[in-house]
Every structure is written in structure tokens, then in C-alpha cells.
UniProtKB/Swiss-Prot annotation:
Gene3D superfamilies, A to Z: Hexapeptide repeat proteins, Udp N-acetylglucosamine O-acyltransferase, C-terminal domain
Gene: lpxA
Protein name as catalogued: Acyl-[acyl-carrier-protein]--UDP-N-acetylglucosamine O-acyltransferase
Coiled coil regions, renumbered to chain: none
HAMAP family membership: LpxA
């Protein structure tokens, strides 16, 4: 039997399969389908025709709009029907036609989406992705498998992110951009192929980062990408100078981390 809270409101034309867990205050509209291994925490709302399936947990207060499919099998030739999972955080908005897939067994079997995110119509989160908090994915954005999107990233409409690519916190990706390489925190990337166009100064300002700090980050950016060495060599060379600047340290740590992808740069030649 399903575990359904007394205060949950389920339309008689919805299907909630035996075994599902439905929390307090959940609302499920007509023609929705909730699978047997799904957990909907308090005050989740499913509008008409929304589907939540697979081994999926949806955090409190999240709203899922019509025709979204959350928790479908991974779109991977390597998936053999294993019991993999999707976790969606609290207070997310998942608009019409959004698709989110569970993970694949070979890579831990988990797709994880954080809190307070906005997924606009027809955007896609593939298997094994990690999406942080306060992320905005505009209409038709596509994340391939194993992508990492850090906190407060904005992805413009129709942009596509290559598998295993990382996009650092507070980065901005312009509409219709092809993100083939890692994007540094606070970076601004546009185009196909995607190239860095400087820093996301507007986003940094909106985040309350002091103007003097923004100027320091700009100087560090110039030293990293216009220095005589490789990007990683230049980043290592300025670490002591900027050890007291949280934002620069985040960029330097991102550059130094192991990754399957090269780094996006301001030029067509990628510097590692």
C-alpha cells in the first residue's frame, strides 16, 4: 500500500501506484502518474499530466508542471535496468516538458538536483548530473550525462552542455551556446563554440559582492588567461597573492581540480 498523508489532495483521475510515499499537503492534479518507488515530501505539487517515476525523491515545496517527466530511465546504452535514483531538492520549479533522468550504475547510480532551482520548459537533466542550488536553466537547455552545475549558475535558452563538463558557481552561459569545456566560477560564456567573454559582473553585483572585490577578480582573471604560461601554471603562480580573496580562490581551486574536460578560454585554442 502507498503511504499517503491525510492532508494530501489527490485528484480522482490521477494514478498513484502502491508503494509511493506522499507527504503532508501534497497536491496531485488530474492525469498525473506517480510510480511505486517515488517519495514526494511535504507540499509538493504536481499539476495535470505530470509524471514522477523511478526511484525518485522530490523535496518539499517543489512544483512540477504539466508534461514534465521526472525520474525516467537514463538515456544511456549502458543502462541495463538497474535500480538507480534521482533526488530533487526543495522549492524547485520544474516547468512544462522538463525531463530529468536517474543515474547509471557504472557511475554511482545517482542524479542529484539541489534546492531552489528553476527549470524552464523542455529543459533536460541527464543521468548522473549534479545540479547545485539556485540554478536557472532556461527553455530548451540540455545537460548531457555527468555534467556538474554549481550554485547560482544561469544557463541561457537553448544552450547545450557536453557530458562530463563542469560549470562553476555564479557563471553565466548565453543562449544557444555550446559548452564543450569547463567554465570557471563567475565566468561568462557565449557562442558556438563557447568562448569566455570575461566575468559575470552583473551576477556578482547582484550577489552582493563588493566592487573592490570584483576589481580584484578581474585582475586575477587577466593574469590567468593572459599570462605567459598555461592557464594552470598562471593560476598556481597567483595563489599566494590572492589567498585572502574567496572568489579568486574558488576560481583557482576549480582550475586545479581534476576534470575530464579542458577549460574554456577567451580564445579558440583551449589552454589546459
Amino acid at each position: 500500500m502507498s503511504n499517503i498523508a491525510e492532508s494530501a489532495r489527490i485528484h480522482p483521475m490521477a494514478v498513484v501506484e502502491d508503494g509511493a510515499t506522499i507527504g503532508e499537503g501534497v497536491k496531485i492534479g488530474p492525469f498525473c502518474h506517480v510510480g511505486p518507488h517515488v517519495v514526494l515530501h511535504a507540499n509538493v505539487e504536481l499539476l495535470a499530466h505530470a509524471v514522477v517515476t523511478g526511484r525518485t525523491v522530490v523535496g518539499k515545496g517543489t512544483r512540477i508542471f504539466p508534461m514534465a517527466v521526472v525520474g525516467g530511465d537514463p538515456q544511456s546504452v549502458h543502462h541495463g535496468g538497474e535500480d538507480t535514483t534521482l533526488t530533487v531538492g526543495a522549492n524547485c520549479t520544474i516547468r512544462e516538458g522538463v525531463t530529468m533522468n536517474t543515474g547509471t550504475a557504472d557511475f554511482g547510480g545517482r542524479t542529484i538536483v539541489g534546492d531552489n532551482n528553476l527549470f524552464l520548459a523542455n529543459s533536460h537533466v541527464a543521468h548522473d548530473c549534479r545540479v547545485g542550488n539556485h540554478v536557472i536553466m532556461s527553455n530548451n537547455v540540455m545537460l548531457a550525462g555527468h555534467v556538474v552545475i554549481e550554485d547560482r549558475v544561469i544557463l541561457g535558452g537553448g544552450s547545450a552542455v557536453h557530458q562530463f563538463t563542469r560549470v562553476g558557481r555564479h557563471a553565466f552561459v548565453g543562449g544557444l551556446s555550446a559548452v564543450s569545456y569547463d567554465v570557471i566560477p563567475y565566468g561568462m560564456l557565449n557562442g558556438n563554440p563557447g568562448l569566455l567573454g570575461g566575468l559575470n559582473v552583473v551576477g556578482m553585483t547582484r550577489a552582493g559582492i563588493d566592487r573592490a572585490v570584483i576589481h580584484r577578480v578581474r585582475r586575477a582573471y587577466k593574469a590567468i588567461f593572459e599570462g605567459t604560461g598555461s592557464v594552470r601554471e598562471n593560476a598556481a603562480a597567483i595563489r599566494d597573492e590572492y589567498a585572502d580573496c574567496e572568489q579568486v580562490v574558488q576560481i583557482l581551486d576549480f582550475i586545479a581540480a581534476d576534470s575530464d574536460r579542458a577549460l574554456s578560454s577567451p580564445t579558440r585554442g583551449q589552454k589546459g
